[in-house]
């Protein structure tokens, strides 16, 4: 991937999302489905199928917002691809019918959804020791402020297992514009959606870009030169 790929800040990320669901008439369900499928394809093809170990165990950490929704969709597809998946959902979103449907879909795929909040970092570390991949879908680009419980304890525990973590869009706890200001974990892999965010500009791990739902003229509206991003690519993602 060429080095002049655009990285976008929090303001532009929010404006692009607003345009997609306004002018371009996407529903949040559609965007979440495409994003989740993209993440699942990256995890399965680039990490699971390339691993020398068989029967990998995946733990998906879901937050209450859209990033968590992406994680629910990704988990469903990963299960459909034949993987062992378990979801940790400490603040399950039961108010929005969209999330209720996603949860029911995962349950129908016999994916275990664990809602229990553990008090100690060591308790989460024991769980993470028993899996091969941690899919981080706690917080997305709209995250602001300090990391609060119950997520702080989870994120603190993740730092010991950076080589297992694949983050959805941005690593949870990162400031989208300033990066890792709370000195949290740095994941092994990152799947940026729409466009990579400023916080990932110097990311040194395996970096993929997906979420092919942005029309060319929307990129042009924000003066983002993206003509070459998916050149000669028929898949949902590319490696950066």
Where are these regions (language model features)?
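Nucleotide and nucleotide-moiety/phosphate-recognizing core
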Residues: 41-138, 146-167
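Generic structural signal for short, flexible, solvent-exposed coil/loop and linker residues
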Residues: 2-5, 9, 15, 20-21, ...
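YjeF_N-associated NAD(P)HX repair module
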Residues: 7-8, 132-240
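Positively charged, low-complexity intrinsically disordered leader regions
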Residues: 1-55, 218-240
């Amino acid at each position: 991937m060429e080095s002049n790929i655009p990285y976008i800040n929090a303001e532009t990320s929010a404006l692009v999302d607003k345009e997609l669901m306004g002018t371009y008439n996407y529903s949040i369900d559609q965007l979440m489905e495409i994003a989740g499928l993209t993440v699942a394809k990256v995890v399965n093809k680039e990490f699971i199928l390339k691993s020398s170990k068989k029967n990998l165990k995946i733990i998906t950490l879901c937050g209450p917002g859209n990033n968590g929704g992406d994680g629910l969709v990704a988990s469903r597809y990963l299960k459909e691809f034949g993987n062992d998946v378990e979801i940790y959902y400490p603040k399950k979103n039961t108010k929005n019918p969209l999330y209720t449907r996603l949860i029911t879909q995962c349950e129908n795929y016999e994916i275990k959804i664990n809602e229990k909040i553990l008090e100690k970092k060591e308790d989460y570390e024991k769980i993470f020791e028993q899996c091969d991949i941690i899919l981080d879908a706690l917080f997305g680009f709209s995250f602001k402020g300090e990391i609060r419980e119950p997520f702080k304890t989870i994120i603190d525990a993740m730092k010991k297992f950076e080589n297992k973590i694949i983050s959805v869009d941005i690593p949870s706890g990162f400031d989208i514009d300033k990066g890792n200001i709370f000195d949290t974990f740095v994941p092994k892999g990152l799947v940026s959606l729409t466009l990579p965010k400023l916080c990932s500009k110097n990311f040194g791990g395996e970096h993929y870009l997906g979420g092919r739902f942005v029309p060319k003229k929307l990129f042009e509206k924000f003066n983002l030169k993206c003509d070459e991003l998916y050149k000669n690519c028929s898949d949902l993602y590319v490696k950066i």
